[in-house]
């Protein structure tokens, strides 16, 4: 056999079927591997070579096959061509042996397990275990719920069976693939199986014609709603018949309490499946019809009037909900209602797992009779409207003077018994939607005070006064802050069998449970103008934030460019340019004009301190009035002025005087020029310009000293106010005056 040991991953990933090999390339192989599919001639040749040389030297065998490595030849023989390889069905003895070996070595060391099974390779053992022998694999018949999950997942994921298998614990990707290809595809495509959504699942309930609040409806109404994490509540129709119990749905799983890292991903995928499955019910849902419900206990009731009230309160603060109904609620009318019955034990006991919740129950537990006797409440009047359900939201406010207060926002408004015209005791538990709290900052109690003042009946005066006192005490507090936990957590915990403990209340906010408050008027839309509201100062302005800033804004491309520049080279700094750099710029310009470098650059030349504007202005003035021409080159080491003034144009004379004096100091004081030509020639002979490199012949070049020592001297030279410059300027004027007298066109010299 081969001398080189193979890793288990390589053994598992290499297939024994006749196809291209995706074997990782290894270092040290002298031949380039050919990844092309094995041909029949190569297989025949490999069989003959194995018969001749055996299976001990694969390098020798690979040398007879072009572009095939010894590793490829070995695997081709062991996985495909070996006549001892068993490709048929598994026997009971083999299955029992695999089970024993897995218990001994674990479900990952398949290469080692395959060595104990003659004729089987690691890949075969692995697939046999995961698809058939694993006790966690379900072998029962496929249920309709599993079919629906496969159908919905296949519409979105296609043939990604491994991803679909994550949605069905206990089912393998291979079994799901076989079930789809053999049974489900034909039934779905030809017989219309599962095409009508969830209708077949609910056929036994015979309530398809009844209106119901579906989970999809809750999803569209509330952004905090997570359908796959609501363990224990049910939807009921007005006549009390249960349409769907979420706790028994196959799509719902208990909240992930274990440490499975993929649990959250699975829940999101299940949520997508559930949303699509509920689409059919939402589209085929009939218009809501009035009904009646006479008796219930231990439940929270959803009232249509609450939905109407939320519409009226939230129309100025949010656009998240679509509000199609806008009605006026009468104080004397009562209408049949739709409600959401939430199992108290399932929800409230599960809330105990939230750290903030035990304190909120203290207030409820202080008056168990007032809070547990839900049957003492009647539903307020309202026309049928879509039920808007938002998650539970608890907020805590300071406790004052022993008044037990709490706010239990389940988006459910439980209104007290309506007072008759002659008056009477009643209880009110006004609850506020968290959406109102989310989009407006004033305290909840101030809103309740204004809402109750709209009432019209006589019995509302006492309730209005009581809540006004509470509002006056609460108005000085800051608006309700964001809670440190998601409101949806109250429905996201698994239900238990604990009973509601209401003996030690906690102090939260809003409804006064310890006092008897009379509310006999329904909640109506406020008629007070927006600018006259008491809490208008607390409301968040609707001004766009983009116009609040006064600083100029840099376009995004420039921001990105500056950020990249600072990231690469550090923060940008503004560095002032020294005068030495300006001198180099002037030298470069003059060098381009004259063709030669007429300045002497020394290592210790000082940095000039003249103003940048004066320097540039003087250079422009000289360049504008004079034309520069190239110097005659006599020797490579020096540049001398010509002695023959008749052959040189007047521009050369002026250029010499103006270019040499600003940067070079006069060698001696004998250079006072006279109007005669011999003085000019003597001055020209006195000066020589050294190039940047030292002149090898000191006799032919005169080394000039440093430049001016002070700013005043520098300015005098720059502006041409030295004695020599004035003399040269006067000579230039005389020369040009004679030139203009003989010429036909007049030329003016601007200095």
UniProtKB/Swiss-Prot annotation:
Residues 58-81, 110-133, 161-184 bind DNA. Residues 1-22 are annotated as: Disordered. There is a cross-link at residues 199, 591, 601 (Glycyl lysine isopeptide (Lys-Gly) (interchain with G-Cter in SUMO2)). One of its GO terms (cellular component) is nucleus. Residues 230-294 are annotated as: Transcriptional activation domain. This is Myb-related protein A. Keywords: Acetylation, Activator, Differentiation, DNA-binding, Isopeptide bond, Nucleus, Repeat, Spermatogenesis, Transcription, Transcription regulation, Ubl conjugation. Transcription factor that specifically recognizes the sequence 5'-YAAC[GT]G-3'. Acts as a master regulator of male meiosis by promoting expression of piRNAs: activates expression of both piRNA precursor RNAs and expression of protein-coding genes involved in piRNA metabolism, such as PIWIL1. The piRNA metabolic process mediates the repression of transposable elements during meiosis by forming complexes composed of piRNAs and Piwi proteins and governs the methylation and subsequent repression of transposons, which is essential for the germline integrity. Transcriptional activator of SOX30. SUPFAM superfamilies: Homeodomain-like. Predominantly in the testis. Very low levels in the ovaries, spleen and brain. Its main location: nucleus. It comes from the Eukaryota. It is found in: Nucleus. The modification N6-acetyllysine is found at residue 393. One of its GO terms (biological process) is spermatogenesis. Coiled coil: none annotated.
């Amino acid at each position: 056999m081969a001398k080189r040991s193979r890793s288990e991953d390589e053994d598992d990933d290499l297939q024994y079927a006749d196809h291209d090999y995706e074997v990782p390339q290894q270092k040290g192989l002298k031949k380039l591997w050919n990844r092309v599919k094995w041909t029949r001639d190569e297989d025949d040749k490999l069989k003959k070579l194995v018969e001749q040389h055996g299976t001990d030297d694969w390098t020798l065998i690979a040398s007879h096959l072009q572009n095939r490595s010894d590793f490829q030849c070995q695997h081709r023989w062991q996985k495909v061509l070996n006549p001892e390889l068993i490709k048929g069905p598994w026997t009971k003895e083999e299955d029992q042996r695999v089970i024993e070996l897995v218990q001994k070595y674990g479900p990952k060391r398949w290469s080692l397990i395959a060595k104990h099974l003659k004729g089987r390779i690691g890949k075969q053992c692995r697939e046999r275990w995961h698809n058939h022998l694993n006790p966690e694999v379900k072998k029962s018949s496929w249920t309709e719920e599993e079919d629906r999950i496969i159908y919905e997942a296949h519409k979105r994921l296609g043939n990604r069976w491994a991803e679909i298998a994550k949605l069905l614990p206990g089912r393998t990707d291979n079994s799901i693939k076989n079930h789809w290809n053999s049974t489900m595809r034909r039934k779905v495509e030809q017989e219309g199986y599962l095409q009508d959504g969830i209708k077949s699942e609910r056929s036994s309930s015979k309530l398809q014609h009844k209106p119901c609040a579906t989970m999809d409806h809750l999803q569209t109404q509330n952004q905090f709603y997570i359908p796959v994490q609501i363990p224990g509540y049910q939807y009921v129709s007005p006549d009390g018949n249960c349409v769907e119990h979420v706790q028994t749905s196959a799509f719902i799983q208990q909240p992930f309490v274990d440490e499975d890292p993929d649990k959250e991903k699975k829940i999101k995928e299940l949520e997508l499946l559930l949303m699509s499955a509920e689409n059919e019910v939402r589209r085929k849902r009939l218009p809501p019809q009035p009904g009646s419900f006479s008796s219930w206990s231990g439940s929270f009731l959803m009232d249509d009037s609450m939905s109407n009230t939320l519409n009226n309160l939230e129309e100025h603060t949010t656009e998240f909900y679509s509000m199609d109904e806008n009605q006026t609620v009468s104080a004397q009318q009562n209408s049949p209602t739709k409600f959401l019955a939430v199992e108290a034990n399932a929800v409230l006991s599960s809330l105990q797992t939230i750290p903030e919740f035990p304190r909120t129950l203290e207030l409820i537990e202080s008056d168990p009779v007032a809070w547990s006797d839900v049957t003492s409440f009647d539903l307020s009047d309202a026309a049928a409207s879509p039920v808007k359900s938002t998650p539970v939201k608890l907020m805590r406010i300071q406790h004052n003077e022993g008044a037990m207060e709490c706010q239990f926002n389940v988006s459910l408004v439980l209104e007290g018994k309506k007072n008759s015209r002659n008056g009477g005791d009643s209880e009110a538990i006004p609850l506020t939607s968290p959406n109102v709290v989310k989009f407006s900052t004033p305290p909840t109690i101030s809103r309740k005070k204004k809402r109750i003042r709209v009432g019209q009946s006589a019995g509302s005066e006492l309730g209005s006064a009581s809540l006004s006192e509470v509002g006056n005490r609460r108005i000085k507090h800051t608006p309700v802050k964001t809670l440190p936990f998601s409101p949806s957590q109250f429905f996201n915990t698994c239900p238990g069998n604990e009973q509601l403990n209401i003996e030690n209340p906690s102090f939260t906010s809003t409804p006064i449970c310890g006092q008897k408050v009379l509310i006999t008027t329904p909640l109506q839309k406020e008629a007070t103008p927006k600018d006259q509201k008491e809490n208008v100062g607390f409301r968040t302005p609707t001004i766009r934030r983009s116009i609040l800033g006064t600083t100029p804004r840099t376009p995004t491309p420039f921001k990105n460019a500056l950020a990249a520049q600072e990231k690469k080279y550090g923060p940008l700094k503004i560095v002032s340019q020294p005068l030495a750099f300006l001198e180099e710029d002037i030298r470069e310009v003059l060098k381009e004009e004259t063709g030669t470098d007429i300045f002497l650059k020394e290592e210790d030349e000082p940095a000039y301190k003249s103003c940048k504007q004066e320097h540039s202005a003087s250079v422009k003035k000289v360049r504008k009035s004079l034309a520069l021409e190239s110097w005659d080159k006599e020797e490579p080491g020096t540049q001398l002025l010509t002695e023959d003034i008749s052959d040189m144009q007047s521009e050369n004379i002026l250029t010499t005087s103006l270019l040499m004096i600003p940067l070079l100091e006069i060698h001696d004081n004998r250079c006072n020029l006279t109007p005669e030509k011999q003085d000019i020639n003597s001055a020209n002979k006195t000066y020589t310009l050294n190039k940047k490199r030292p002149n090898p012949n000191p006799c032919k070049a005169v080394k000039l000293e440093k430049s001016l020592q002070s700013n005043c001297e520098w300015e005098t030279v720059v502006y041409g106010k030295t004695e020599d410059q004035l003399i040269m300027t006067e000579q230039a004027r005389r020369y040009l005056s004679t030139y203009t007298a003989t010429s036909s066109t007049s030329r003016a010299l601007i200095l």
